[in-house]
């Protein structure tokens, strides 16, 4: 029996006991009518799918994002490690574990990234766009430094939203220079900074700071609408010309590209088109990186829901 072994180091045949984060949990029933828990456990090194057969206990979806203590055996299912849980319980105040082992954090210097974001905002030449960005960064900067960018899709670790935003700003800055005849750099950088910033109000966070669910506002409105409304409000307060306010709102409302991907409207100017593509590039590359981290070199990953395919981790 091995204790508190990191998920990245697990291999078929390992018998383990320790503390992990219950990333997802769903009560299910087999074809024979027997109950079981379908779950995923995580630590700072990765995620492993897990099953607890013949389980009809209290642990379920409401416990996602919390720390759980388990005992189990690692096997292999369709070429991917899977954990069969033999014993489990939620951790409580009497338990002793190292949180730094469990909570995944963005693999960047967050302070350095935040300072770079601030410098990008200061470089926005249009004073109206710059002032809106400065105000929203003042309101939400602390949250931006820490919250994930998503529950599970991409950048779902502490500091993930900052990493995603910083990556996108760097890309937007480069592309605004490449396409300087076509693109308004100030509008593109402002839209890039603000496109996901209302996820601060959209998400419910666990005590560990990970996304567990959506707030009522997040569920009913979503971060696109929340962000556009906030931009409109600040724009009025600051006396921004209406045409500029509408363009900046459009950037936020259209950045998912197409209605089937959650866009309120489709991109209808060069800057909004570019923003939706930059967002897609960065989120897609993070999905690939996370899959490669969990997939041995020379093999294919498990099917990835977000992109509906497996990827090959080449040497």
Residue spans of the language-model regions?
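Acidic/His-rich, divalent-metal-binding segments that scaffold phosphate/diphosphate chemistry
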Residues: 95-218, 258
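OB-fold single-stranded nucleic acid-binding module
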Residues: 25-35, 46-100
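Divalent metal-coordination and catalytic microenvironments
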Residues: 20, 65, 168, 279
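Divalent metal-dependent catalytic cores for phosphoryl transfer on phosphate-bearing substrates
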Residues: 153, 163, 174-294
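Short, acidic/hydrophobic/Gly-rich beta-strand patch recurrent on exposed beta strands
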Residues: 38-43, 205
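N-terminal intrinsically disordered, cationic/polar leader segments
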Residues: 276, 293-294, 298-315
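OB-fold nucleic-acid-binding modules
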Residues: 1-16
